[in-house]
Amino acid sequence: MDIAIHHPWIRRPFFPFHSPSRLFDQFFGEHLLESDLFPTSTSLSPFYLRPPSFLRAPSWFDTGLSEMRLEKDRFSVNLDVKHFSPEELKVKVLGDVIEVHGKHEERQDEHGFISREFHRKYRIPADVDPLTITSSLSSDGVLTVNGPRKQVSGPERTIPITREEKPAVTAAPKK
């Protein structure tokens, strides 16, 4: 049986990046990378540091992204739902909240069998009428939910700045 030997001058507090297998860091529904199945760093070498999981662009950066935007004339939410068909998605407005729900039962893919489900909630800004909200699904699997913002009534007005000679903050008396 092999035993990893650590040199006495290498102390664990100085190696905060030492980490065991990243098997549980995976994003559910995505396949494992070969590096997820490598032995832990201590069995390889005391000098080996596994790269952080957030650097794995294909499985981390590509899927499940959600972006909410509040622009001058509209409010929009873009959500990556490429693993779901339109029949497996629901978009509802409850009061001042948009709820997006997606669910598909177990089915086979290239890695085995998988089922997925998610719930997302987004607060509707006060200047967006919930009755005007619409949704659409693009060909590449991005769900867009948006609504127009109410225009501010009244003309724009510039407010003049006056200068005062006394300070806004007075010094506290010294003890």
From Swiss-Prot:
It is found in: Cytoplasm; Nucleus; Secreted; Lysosome. Changing R69C: In CTRCT16; uncertain significance. SUPFAM superfamilies: HSP20-like chaperones. Residues 146-175 are annotated as: Disordered. GO terms for biological process: apoptotic process involved in morphogenesis; cellular response to gamma radiation; lens development in camera-type eye; microtubule polymerization or depolymerization; muscle contraction; muscle organ development; negative regulation of amyloid fibril formation; negative regulation of apoptotic process. Signal peptide: none annotated. The modification N-acetylmethionine is found at M1. Zn(2+) 1 binds at H83, H111, H119. This is Alpha-crystallin B chain. Keywords: Acetylation, Cardiomyopathy, Cataract, Chaperone, Cytoplasm, Disease variant, Eye lens protein, Glycoprotein, Lysosome, Metal-binding, Myofibrillar myopathy, Nucleus, Oxidation, Phosphoprotein, Secreted, Zinc. The gene is CRYAB.
